[in-house]
UniProtKB/Swiss-Prot annotation:
Protein name: Nucleolin 2
Gene Ontology annotations for the cellular component aspect, listed alphabetically: nucleolus
Extra remark: Disruption of NUCL1 induces NUCL2 expression.
Function per UniProt: Involved in pre-rRNA processing and ribosome assembly.
Segments for region (Disordered): 1-386, 458-481, 544-636
Originating species: Arabidopsis thaliana
Tissue specificity annotation: Expressed at low levels in flower buds.
PANTHER family: EUKARYOTIC TRANSLATION INITIATION FACTOR 4B/4H, EUKARYOTIC TRANSLATION INITIATION FACTOR 4H
SMART domains, per database record: RRM
Length: 636
């Protein structure tokens, strides 16, 4: 009782002092409207209490409590004697116990219900609040309480009838109704707030409010702005009810209301906003504050509070734990995935290395396989013939045999010469075996009669010098001979027939080509014949007669060299014509053989040779080459 008396003293002193600064500092224009409504309600409540005092016949004890309540309303303005305060403390002690019950959301007990029945007759305002909460709990004790309250006043019964249908409406709509309602009876506002909560602790809150005087209901409506101070909780339980009606309007956050309803299963949102508003969202703190308050009231209420609060806490904790576990699982999955990826990468990298190693081995094998093919020159040049170039013009067969004596036995030496018997400067040397020919090839570049001998395999086709000689070693392949000296007066077809018939004795003739002049269409005096066999025999026909002229047969060279050779030799018969001719192309064909100064006077007027000072040889060669090029294009 000593603790409760202290609470009663603080309840009387603090309301007026705490409400003013909080209103100034925290309330908006919307709060000022609420204060005007509460002031009107105070006056109306006082009038209703005075009317009901005359009408009701209640025991003196109850009247004294109601008179004390009316006096407590006046104490906020004019402080009365300590004797009245003591009487209030006795009635307010019950308020403290009931308010403790409110903080610790506990299920209703029959004893506080009976107290509420006796206290409901004290004032209409408190009774109406009791009637509002009673329909929420569907228990017989609540029904008995409703009966006693209905006998107290007709307004209470009407309010009870209203609570049942309103119970099933949404909480947000009920809050709006509480804000907008400025009726004479607080029952209408209380009736609407109760269904919004739908919890058992609201009934005990109403009990505590009914046991308190009108002072609690009227004066507490003003200090509602102190929503975030635990001191207001200790002052009055009725103050919590009125202040709770206004605090939800200020918050206007459905999320916080839902959280408060879940965390405080047995306590109302109004109590949580006024009692534990500093931590409305903190569910654990609200429950802890509720437990010590429940211990002051009764141990049974504390147990009920713990059961209900514990029943609703695990979902939130489970949700958090589940979220944490899900995060951990996701992180673990990611880490496992990364590890798997790394392993897979490592596995992928190693096979690549193995593959590369295998490829290297294969490459080595391939290179080894290619190595035996390097001496293919010997196999390809299995012919025993070498081409010897840059030979001295005074060389003889004996000189060549002595030169290659160290390499091996020389079987044959074929030196190329012109028609007049002059040596061309190259020849072919045949050895007894390919090995001897390869050994002789190593002597390439050595001096022979003052000249560096150029040696190469006859069948090798790398350079223009060895391409022609190499054809001698090709037995089955077709080879070409160059024929000149036949009469050019014959037609092209006639010349081809005579040549084919003449050389068919040696072997099979595959092709006969007779170059002609583009302008006249006449033969140019030479031809090319391809033979698959009898090449050597065809060469022996050199000097024979065809078409009234002696022919010269030799091995064919590349067409460029043939052209040069034909241009050099053609003037032998046509020199008189070209020498005195006015046509520049013909005069230029044989200009190489003529002295350099012979055609200088003729070329001087053109200015072609005056600047160079080299004579007419070079320009005449260019002109002749142009003519021959056009002719060979026709061949192809």
């Amino acid at each position: 009782m000593g603790k409760s008396s202290k609470k009663s003293v603080t309840e009387v002193e603090t309301p007026a002092s705490m409400t003013k600064p909080l209103k100034k500092g925290k309330r908006d224009a919307e709060e000022d409207l609420d204060m005007q409504v509460t002031k009107k309600q105070k006056k109306e409540l006082i009038d209703v209490v005075q009317k009901e005092k005359a009408e009701k016949t209640v025991p003196k004890k109850v009247e004294s409590s109601s008179s004390d309540a009316s006096d407590s309303d006046e104490e906020e303005k004019t402080k009365e004697t300590p004797s009245k305060l003591k009487d209030e403390s006795s009635s307010e002690e019950e308020d403290d116990s009931s308010s403790d019950e409110e903080i610790a959301p506990a299920k209703k007990r029959p004893e506080p219900i009976k107290k509420a029945k006796v206290e409901s007759s004290s004032s209409d305002d408190d009774s109406t609040s009791d009637e509002e909460t009673a329909p929420v709990k569907k228990q017989p004790a609540v029904l008995e309480k409703a009966k006693v309250e209905s006998s107290s006043s007709d307004d209470d019964s009407s309010s009870d009838e209203e609570t049942v249908p309103v119970k099933k409406q949404p909480a947000v709509l009920e809050k709006a109704k509480i804000e907008s309602s400025s009726s004479d009876d607080d029952s209408s506002s209380d009736e609407e707030t109760v269904p919004m909560k739908k919890q058992t602790a609201v009934l005990e809150k109403a009990k505590a409010e009914s046991s308190s005087s009108d002072d609690g209901s009227s004066s507490d409506e003003e200090p509602t702005p102190a929503k975030k101070e635990p001191i207001v909780v200790k002052k009055d339980s009725s103050d919590e009810s009125s202040s709770d009606e206004e605090t939800p309007v200020v918050k206007k956050k459905p999320t916080t209301v839902v959280k408060d309803a879940k965390a405080e299963s047995s306590s109302s949102e109004e109590e949580s906003s006024s009692d534990d508003e500093p931590t409305p969202a903190k569910k654990p703190t609200v429950v802890k504050n509720a437990k010590p308050a429940a211990k002051d009231s009764s141990s049974s209420e504390e147990d009920s509070d713990e059961e209900e609060s514990d029943d609703e806490k695990p979902p939130t904790k489970k949700a958090k734990v589940s979220s944490k576990t899900s995060k951990q699982e996701s992180s673990s999955d990611e880490s496992s995935d990364e590890s798997d990826k790394e392993e897979s990468k490592d596995e992928k990298v190693t096979p690549k290395k193995k593959d590369s190693d295998v490829e290297m081995v294969d490459a080595e094998q391939k290179s080894n396989a290619k190595q035996p093919k390097t001496p293919t020159n010997q196999t390809q040049g299995g012919s025993k013939t070498l081409f010897a170039g840059n030979l001295s013009y005074q060389i003889a067969r004996s000189d060549i045999e002595n030169f290659f004596k160290e390499a091996g036995e020389v079987v044959d030496v074929r030196l190329s010469s012109f028609d007049d018997g002059s040596f061309k400067g190259y020849g072919h040397i045949e050895f007894a075996s390919p090995e001897e020919a390869q050994k002789a090839l190593e002597m390439n570049g050595k001096l022979l009669l003052g000249r560096d001998v150029r040696l190469d395999l006859a069948n090798e086709r790398g350079t223009p010098r060895n391409s022609n000689p190499g054809r001698k070693g090709e037995g089955s392949q077709s080879r070409t001979i160059y024929v000149r000296g036949f009469s050019s007066s014959l037609g092209e077809d006639e010349i081809k027939k005579e040549l084919r018939s003449h050389f068919s004795k040696c072997g099979e003739v595959t092709r006969v080509h007779v170059p002609t002049d583009r302008e006249t269409g006449a033969s140019r005096g030479f031809a090319y014949i391809d033979l698959t066999s009898g090449f050597d025999e065809a060469l022996q026909l050199s000097g024979s007669e065809i078409g009234g002229g002696n022919i010269h047969v030799e091995e064919s060279r590349p067409r460029d060299s043939d052209e040069g050779r034909s241009s050099n030799r053609a003037p032998a018969r046509g020199a008189p014509r070209g020498r005195h001719s006015d046509r520049a192309p013909r005069g230029g064909r044989f200009s190489d053989r003529a002295p350099r100064g012979r055609h200088s006077d003729r070329g001087a007027p053109r200015g072609r040779f005056s600047t160079r000072g080299r004579g007419p040889s070079k320009p005449s060669v260019m002109e002749s080459s142009k003519g021959t090029k056009t002719v060979f294009n026709d061949e192809e």
